[in-house]
Regions:
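Structured, active/binding-site neighborhoods that engage oxygen-rich ligands
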Residues: 1-315
C-alpha cells in the first residue's frame, strides 16, 4: 500500500492523464509518510487491538474523535453529526455533500486484511466503517474493495477477483455499473487511456475524490497491469485524479495477490521499514514499523477467524 501511494501521491489531484515513471527513488531516501487512508487504518488497528474483533461502531467513532484530526472533505460533516448525536447511517448522510467521496475506499483494504479469505466478513466490517461518514456509492465502493482484498489471499486471477468484489454490492449501483463498464471497455479497446476517457465521460463529477471514479480507475489499473505490480500502480498514477488513493489500493491488492516474494526486487530492496503517521493522527506515536504493523494485522486476522464470521444476512 505504501509503495503504491509513493507513486501516486506526487500526481494526486491532476485530472489530465500522463505517463508516469515506475520505481520511485524516494522509497529508499526517507521514511514513508501515511496518507489519510492509512492514518485511519492506523487508528482503526489500534482500536481493534483494544476492543477485539467484535469492535462496535461507537468504539470506532470514539477512536476517530480522539486520534484523527482531518478537517477536509466528508470528515468535518460527519464530526458535526456526531456532535448532534446522529449515529450511522445518519451521520454519513445528513448535510454531507461529500457522502459519496472516497474516504472510506481509501481505508477499506484493512478490513480485507483482517478477514483474509472471508470477503463477506470483510464486507461487514467495511460497511459499518463506511456508513460512519458516507452513504451510497461511498459505502458500496468501499465494500467492493474490502471484499477484493479479502479474496486476494486465495484468488489470484484479476478478473475473477474483481467479480468477487462485485458480488458483494448491488449489481445496479453506480459503483458496480462503473466497474463493469470498465471491464467491458478495456476488453473492447485494450487501452488504458481510452478506457479512462470513457469512464470519466460517463461517471465523472466535479469532485476529484468521487468514489465511483476511484473504483473504476482501480479496476482499470488491475486489468491493464495484468498481475504485474509496477505496471498496475503506474497505470493508476498515469490516470491521475485520486491517484494517492487508487495507487495505494492497487498496490495493496497486487501485494496480496503476489505476496512479498512476488514483488519486484528493486521495490522490495528500496522499501524502508519505518512508517511515519500523517499530520491527521493525534495522540498516538507518529512512528511505526511496517513489519510490526503487518504482524499486528495478521494477529487480528487470526482473532477474527477464531471469533467466527458474521452471517451475511445480518447486513
Amino acid at each position: 500500500k505504501v509503495m503504491g501511494a509513493a507513486v501516486g501521491r506526487p500526481v494526486d489531484g491532476q485530472k489530465q492523464s500522463q505517463e508516469v515513471a515506475g520505481y520511485p527513488a524516494a522509497l529508499s531516501q526517507a521514511p514513508a509518510v501515511s496518507g489519510e487512508g492509512t492514518d485511519f487504518q492506523l487508528v482503526w488497528l489500534r482500536a481493534m487491538q483494544g476492543a477485539g474483533p467484535e469492535i462496535a461502531t461507537d468504539e470506532l467513532i470514539s477512536a476517530w474523535l480522539r486520534h484523527l484530526g482531518h478537517v477536509h472533505g466528508e470528515y468535518p460533516y460527519a464530526r458535526a453529526n456526531f456532535g448532534r448525536d446522529m449515529p450511522p447511517p445518519v451521520s454519513g448522510v445528513f448535510d454531507n455533500p461529500f457522502r459519496e467521496a472516497l474516504g472510506a475506499v481509501a481505508r477499506a483494504d484493512l478490513w480485507g486484511m483482517v478477514a483474509p479469505g472471508d470477503p463477506e466478513q470483510a464486507a461487514w466490517f467495511a460497511r459499518r466503517d463506511a456508513m460512519i461518514d458516507h452513504s451510497g456509492a461511498g459505502v458500496e465502493a468501499a465494500i467492493w474493495l474490502a471484499g477484493m482484498a479479502s479474496a486476494a489471499f486465495a484468488e489470484k486471477d484479476i478478473s475473477r477477483l474483481i467479480e468477487q468484489g462485485l458480488g458483494l454490492i448491488p449489481s445496479d449501483c453506480r459503483a458496480a455499473r462503473a466497474v463493469r463498464d470498465v471491464v467491458r471497455w478495456h476488453g473492447e479497446h485494450a487501452s488504458w487511456d481510452r478506457t479512462r476517457e470513457m469512464l470519466l465521460r460517463s461517471y465523472s463529477s466535479e469532485d476529484g475524490r468521487d468514489s465511483v471514479v476511484a473504483a473504476g480507475l482501480i479496476a482499470l489499473s488491475l486489468l491493464n497491469g495484468r498481475g504485474d505490480f509496477e505496471r498496475s500502480v503506474v497505470t493508476a498514477a498515469s490516470c491521475g485524479w485520486s491517484s494517492g488513493c487508487t495507487c495505494a489500493a492497487t498496490g495493496t491488492l497486487l501485494g496480496l495477490v503476489l505476496g512479498v516474494e512476488g514483488l519486484p526486487d528493486e521495490w522490495r530492496s528500496a522499501a524502508r521499514d519505518q512508517l511515519v503517521a500523517g499530520w491527521g493522527v493525534v495522540g498516538l506515536s507518529r512512528n511505526a514499523s511496517s513489519g510490526v504493523l503487518a504482524d499486528q494485522t495478521c494477529e487480528l486476522g487470526r482473532l477474527v477467524a477464531r471469533a467466527g464470521a458474521t452471517p451475511w444476512e445480518e447486513l
